[in-house]
Amino acid sequence: MTPRHIAVQQARRIVVKIGSSSLTREDGGLDLNRIDSVARLVSAKARRGCEILIVSSGAVAAGLEPLGLSSRPKDLASVQAAAAMGQGYLMARWSSAFQAHHLHVAQILLTAADVMQREHYTNAMSALDKLLAFGVVPIINENDAVTTREVRFGDNDRLAAYVAQMVGADVLVLLTDVDGLCTAPPSQPGARLITEVYATDELGGIDVRGAGSSVGTGGMATKLHAASMAQHGGIGVILTSADRLNEVLDGQPVGTWFEPTRNRPASRTLWIAHVAPSAGQILIDAGARRAITRGKKSLLPAGITDVLGVFSAGEVIDIVDDSGLIARGISRYDSDSLAKLMGHKQEEKQKEHMRPAVHRDDLAVLVQE
């Protein structure tokens, strides 16, 4: 058996994300047959002992027809109105579809602000855990009716990756309207499906343009980012067409499989690495980089060469060097204090200097060396 087949067959929890393009008909209305099909397949997998969460787009698309709109509006207020109109209809359809298989669903609407704040993040995690314990299928969506343009996920691919990390999922399934990740846009001659992606693979040269839709917000670039985020969090990812969900849940080799990293970080480390907003940035030297990446040590002020931005002690900051982002962590100093201490080795500052700027327990290293 392949690693993918083993991962899916042995999965305790799976997050399935289905986008607007896969949930809507050509005329823009909800594809009720698709919802019924997903509910049937998920219910069958649930009966075999797997807990499944669904991240469902489609609220805005469901609200277009009642509001007399033919395509997704551009202004935020109209998007919010369509989401408010469509979310209730969307949930009613999911509820009806799962009731046919004797399962209940629960609506969970999240905003980017919810997951960025640690307390809100842990509360959402606890609520999802409890719903799964009750045998309920959570249906999760971004709360488009109250989000702001500045603070929002922007697409449900990232939301699905956050949810997968939040609940400790074993597998994340990203369903879309193409077969998987290809070497070029699928419409181009010679484009080939990439069947497997490993954490160390370099994908920067792949052209992922042109895979969006008129009713959704997420293209292939956002799916690739979400897949990478989950993959580096120890979660296997399958990216494929919504038409292949039956084969996906059976562990068959369809779409693109993102092999997870071997060691799964703790939930708090994942939150620091991928979710918490950055309050500032510090630049470190080569010795400090070796200490935190290879030596698994805390970051000391002596290894810091510059402090950028204004932040307080207890906030998450980016740790960079000349090559780019190395790690993220919770600073034990405010920016002014850190700027005064960085690089100092004088005897009179030795005691303060030896206190970590970022303790290793508060550090999420993002590079592999």
Tell where the protein language model's regions lie, with residue ranges.
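C-terminal catalytic "cap/lid" subdomain
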Residues: T2-R72, L76-H104, I108-E369
